[in-house]
């Protein structure tokens, strides 16, 4: 949903429809997800993306997994689900998304070196290890002066500081580890974000840096294809 057809949020009505039509059955979701090229970043996201185009922003993958996992988690009717995929992998006949021969639906890049935001989404939701993660660390060149800040934390509500000033108005997102600060105004130039959680006498922190230099909408024209090893 949101990738090959329909919209991200349509998974909810689809599951509820199956529950109503087949109440004595159970559902196993064989795969779900979206591609993410970590070199493609934007704040302008809709509820669907044309997978035949060369533009696969990481932020769209993040949005897909945030919402669709939350739907899966609150529907016990779905007894099993399989996210697609752990790692980007070779698809030699493909030529889309900015890297020929690559399926980029992984939570990590093909070389296993970069963990996408969606990786930390699942780690925060599933793992007992402490997770504190500010999203969009690769979306450095910001398009909007007024934006939102998202944090994944399975160790409690985070405090977030922008250039040393604490942000107010945090709200819960789709699950208990999902925290969002809306209507955050960036300053011109560098903007340093720091998330902090204190738990059991230990302080956890995460920091990223964004840059704002005026309103823009990069779109697909800002990116070129990258030739990388197929892995075959």
Language model: regions and residue ranges:
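Substrate-binding/catalytic cleft of secreted carbohydrate-active enzymes
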Residues: 1-125, 129-143, 164, 174, ...
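Surface beta-strand/loop "capping" patches
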Residues: 123-155, 221-232
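Beta-strand signatures of extracellular beta-sandwich domains
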Residues: 157-161
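Short hydrophobic alpha-helix segments
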Residues: 170-171, 207
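Surface-exposed, short loops/turns at beta-strand junctions within beta-sandwich domains
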Residues: 183-190
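Edge beta-strands of extracellular beta-sandwich domains
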Residues: 201-214
